[in-house]
From Swiss-Prot:
Coarse class of the protein's main subcellular location: nucleus
Free-text disruption phenotype from the record: Cell polarity defects; delocalized actin patches and abnormal budding. Cell lysis at high temperature.
Gene Ontology BP terms: establishment of cell polarity; regulation of cell wall organization or biogenesis; response to pheromone; Rho protein signal transduction
Note: Present with 6330 molecules/cell in log phase SD medium.
Gene Ontology CC: cytoplasm; cytosol; nucleus
Function: Probably acts as a GEF (guanine nucleotide exchange factor) for the Rho family of small GTP-binding proteins (G proteins) that stimulates the dissociation of GDP to enable subsequent binding of GTP. May also chaperone the processing and/or trafficking of small GTPases independently of GEF activity. Involved in the control of polarized cell growth via CDC42-mediated signaling. Involved in the control of cell-wall organization via RHO1-mediated signaling. May also function via RHO2 and RHO4.
Location(s), subcellular: Nucleus; Cytoplasm
Subunit structure and binding partners: Interacts with CDC42; the interaction is direct. Interacts with RHO1; the interaction is direct. Interacts with RHO2. Interacts with RHO4. Interacts with CDC11.
Gene: BEM4
Name of protein: GTPase-GDP dissociation stimulator BEM4
Length: 633
């Protein structure tokens, strides 16, 4: 960089007490802009950034920029030509400052110490909200350039520094929303500005997500719907995150590297599809961040906006489902997360959305749209009366069949919890065997998905336990008889689930293969529930002792008539002994849980004594069990 030459060319601007005193005819203006362009290009070199910081040039540029923007914003006496000239100067100075602070903390500190906080918060924020320079909008390209470079300046200032981002966030978030709103219907005419602006908004929302207006949430959903319709069915290469360098009149910017490496100026054609995919990813992330993190959002009296938001999200999912595009899985999951978090808000009853969701379920084959609809419906059921009312609008059979279309693990969340809320003793009695078979198949497929997505485990376990609890024992027996793999699926779900299944099968008094019984006992005596490493609770011990008691009382299921043939004596006597020893220690406990377990243990002990009383030859383990049983009396 020929620093002296650049400094000489900028002397009229730098030495003037006010930039208003600087001649601004075309010749002079062209000269200033040319010198600043040279300076901006030279600041690609890190050593030149150090020079402008240490020599005070950066400090002077900040002063000039603040003066120029202050005149543009507040001086009503200047002509439109002078105003345009000052905006031209401001644009180039913004570009120079943006490039000077790339990967240079010293220059960032200079910017802050020289009054840069007001510059960034107020003046640059004002540029982002600039709608026009002249009433005939003849300077739209200048506005676009100013805003693009302002976004770059803010991004390069914040990148990699959480403290700076937190300080700027409250002042910049609003202007960024305004910037995006003005481009909603023309974003393809200024793609870099919109993509980088939405990316910066992502960073801002990570640290400042509270108190966003409901209307802004609706705007994001609208924008997402519009972009979704523009995404083409085409595989695209992902762009990487990075800082940016402000661009010149004839150059656009693309990523130069990875991580925190900066944009450099390159000549490259805009790729409309890259823009759509990048913007879709950024805006879906923005919306998800807000609705997932801000627990203070209040949708009271905003029912129509909420309905419109959910409709926009569902329509976006329907539109995107059949398309192949970059980051599709991430985007689709974020959109159903948005719908789910909006519906899960405690101030949202979700009643007005029921018709939308039912229509989606009955007419759409989009698995992600169906997943969103199921989540919303699930959150609309808060009581038994809600469940009854919903089942008047859509049948269990229809909901179960929808579940067979789900594939992505995240799609199952609403389905699992909704079915758990709706199933009861009455409606399962009339459940068609075909629907029941489908339900077990869905749950088994979902169980396989829990290997990759642990959050589904508790939801699936709750539904499986509810299903086994409310189904008639004959239907459970028939289902297992027609599909023996159901037993292995149940057994894999742990002690409590296996206890519930065993209780129902024992009540049915129909014979089952010994292999099925063994699978359930193996699971019960693992003393562990799916996804839980800790020891069983009092509640689990109660269920185990209840199941053991039922089995010993009526062991005709496998024709066990004496200790030699009884499977608990033959294969699980050590486990049975351990349980009774544990429960015997509850003898003096006064809490209801311990008392219930002890009563079950006493019942088991009585049956054991009855079984062994006529047996002449007991093994040492059976003798120990007999002595333990007597201790209960």
């Amino acid at each position: 960089m020929d620093y002296e030459e650049i400094l000489f060319g900028l002397q009229p601007i730098l030495n003037a007490s006010s930039i208003k005193d600087v001649p601004m005819n075309d010749v002079y203006l062209g000269s200033y802009l040319a010198v600043m362009d040279q300076l901006a290009v030279s600041l690609r070199e890190p050593s030149n950034r150090d020079i402008v910081g240490k020599t005070g040039l950066l400090l002077n540029l900040v002063r000039v920029l603040e003066q120029a923007l202050d005149i543009c914003f507040h001086d009503t006496s200047i002509s439109i030509n002078d105003k345009i000239a000052f905006y031209e100067i401001s644009s180039e100075v913004i570009r120079c400052i943006a490039n000077a602070i790339i990967d240079n903390d010293d220059n960032r500190e200079i910017l802050l110490d020289s009054g840069g906080k007001k510059l960034l918060n107020y003046y640059i924020g004002g540029v982002l909200q600039l709608d026009e320079i002249s009433s005939d909008k003849s300077e739209d390209s200048l506005v676009d350039k100013l805003q693009m470079r302002s976004v770059v300046l803010l991004r390069n200032f914040c990148i990699g520094n959480l403290k700076y981002t937190e300080n700027l966030a409250p002042f910049i978030r609003g202007p960024l929303f305004v910037l995006l709103k003005t481009t909603q219907y023309s974003y393809l005419s200024s793609p870099e500005k919109v993509v980088l602006g939405s990316d910066l908004l992502n960073d801002i929302l990570k640290v400042n997500y509270s108190n966003v207006q409901i209307s802004d949430l609706f705007f994001l959903s609208q924008y997402i719907k519009k972009i979704s319709s523009n995404v083409q069915n085409k595989e695209l290469q992902a762009m990487e995150d990075g800082a940016v360098e402000a661009y010149s009149n004839t150059e656009t910017q693309k990523f130069a590297g990875q991580g925190n490496q900066e944009y450099i100026e390159k000549e490259e054609e805009d790729d409309e599809e890259d823009v759509n995919c990048e913007l879709l990813l950024n805006l879906s992330t923005c919306l998800e961040t807000i609705v997932a993190k801000d627990e203070t959002i209040n949708f009271t009296n905003e029912e129509q906006l909420v309905l419109s938001m959910q409709k926009n999200l569902i329509l976006s999912l329907v539109c995107l489902e059949s398309k192949t595009f970059n980051n599709k899985l991430i985007v689709m999951r974020r959109l159903i997360s948005c719908a789910g978090n909006i519906s899960a808000n405690l101030t949202n009853s979700n009643k007005r959305e029921q018709s939308l969701c039912i229509e989606t379920i009955k007419s759409s084959a989009s698995s992600y749209a169906l997943a969103a609809a199921l989540m919303i419906l699930c959150n609309s059921v808060a009581s038994k009366s809600d469940a009854v009312a919903l089942l008047k609008l859509i049948s269990l059979s229809e909901l179960i069949q929808v579940g067979s279309l789900l594939q992505d693990p995240l799609q199952y969340q609403g389905f699992l919890d909704l079915l758990r809320k709706l199933l009861n003793l009455e409606n399962t009695m009339w459940l068609d065997i075909k629907d029941l078979f489908t339900l077990f198949q869905i749950m088994r497929r979902c169980h396989e998905q829990t290997k990759y997505y642990n959050n589904l485990r508790s939801l699936l376990t709750n539904l499986l336990n509810k299903t086994l609890t409310v189904l008639p024992s004959s239907k459970i027996h028939n289902s297992i008889s027609s599909d023996p793999t159901i037993i292995s699926f149940i057994a894999e779900h742990g002690t409590l689930t296996s206890c519930i299944a065993m209780d129902k099968l024992l009540v049915s008094k129909k014979a089952l293969p010994k292999e099925a019984i063994t699978s359930l006992w193996d699971s019960i005596f693992k003393f562990q529930n799916l996804g839980q490493a800790e020891q069983l609770s009092i509640s689990d011990l109660f269920h185990i002792t209840k199941t053991v008691g039922i089995y010993l009382k009526d062991s005709s299921v496998t024709a066990d008539v004496n200790p030699i043939e009884n499977i608990l004596f033959k294969d699980y006597i050590q486990k049975l002994t351990l349980i009774l020893e544990t429960i015997l220690s509850f003898k003096e406990n006064k809490d209801k849980g311990s008392e219930s377990c002890f009563n079950n243990g006493k019942f088991i002990a009585g049956i054991i004594l009855n079984i062994v009383k006529n047996t002449k030859c007991l093994t040492p383990e059976e003798q120990n069990l007999e002595a333990l049983a007597k201790s209960f009396f």
